[in-house]
Design a protein with these regions (language model features):
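TRNA-binding/sensing appendages of the translation machinery
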Residues: 1-19
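Catalytic cores of enzyme domains
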Residues: 13-44, 48-177
Length: 177
């Protein structure tokens, strides 16, 4: 299955084979989650600490040998063009959910890691009740301790596409090179 081709057909701006051997769960990335910058730490099943310890996340990633890295790049009118930023995030999330769903049908043993926390449910049940959709839930690359810029570099895609742009990145790990 050519996941790069599928990703581009779905509408991602960029896609490349994922260098899974370069994935490293870093404590400093997880510490950014714990600092509460996105306000999802401890309140989403897809985020730390509910998504597992750094060691557990690294162990899950180690089981995979390949995959695809995908990106959505938007042009911004200026540094405060929140409308374009929000639209790009919405498009990226929608496209990634489609890619994850299709990949899970084709390759059931895969690990999708999105940009930002899971947004399948309007309100997460964490920590009071179990996840409503554990088979659809999407953790983020950052929740798994990944420094996104390093993953992009190791996989041959830029992280930054120049002034006036914003790029969202996500990946799907597979056991197929």
């Amino acid at each position: 299955m050519d996941l790069v081709k599928l990703a581009l057909e779905i509408g991602f701006s960029h896609a490349a084979p994922l260098n899974a051997s370069a994935l490293r769960a870093l404590p400093e990335v997880r510490e950014m989650c714990a600092s509460g910058r996105c306000r999802r730490y401890g309140s989403s099943w897809s985020c730390p600490p509910a998504c597992g310890s750094l060691e557990e996340c690294q162990g899950r990633m180690r089981a995979y040998t390949g995959g695809v890295l995908v990106q959505t790049t938007a042009e911004l009118a200026d540094d405060f063009d929140y409308e374009s930023m929000s639209k790009a995030q919405e498009v990226h999330k929608k496209n990634f959910f489609t890619l994850a769903r299709q990949t899970r049908l084709l390759i059931p043993d895969c690990l999708p890691l999105t940009a930002g926390s899971c947004t399948i449910c309007r309100s997460c049940t964490c920590p009071d009740r179990p996840c409503r959709f554990p088979n659809k839930m999407l953790s983020s690359m950052e929740a798994y301790g990944l420094l996104v810029s390093a993953v992009c570099e190791a996989s041959g895609l830029p992280y930054y596409y120049g002034p006036g742009t914003l790029t969202y990145s996500a990946c799907i790990l597979t056991k197929e090179g």
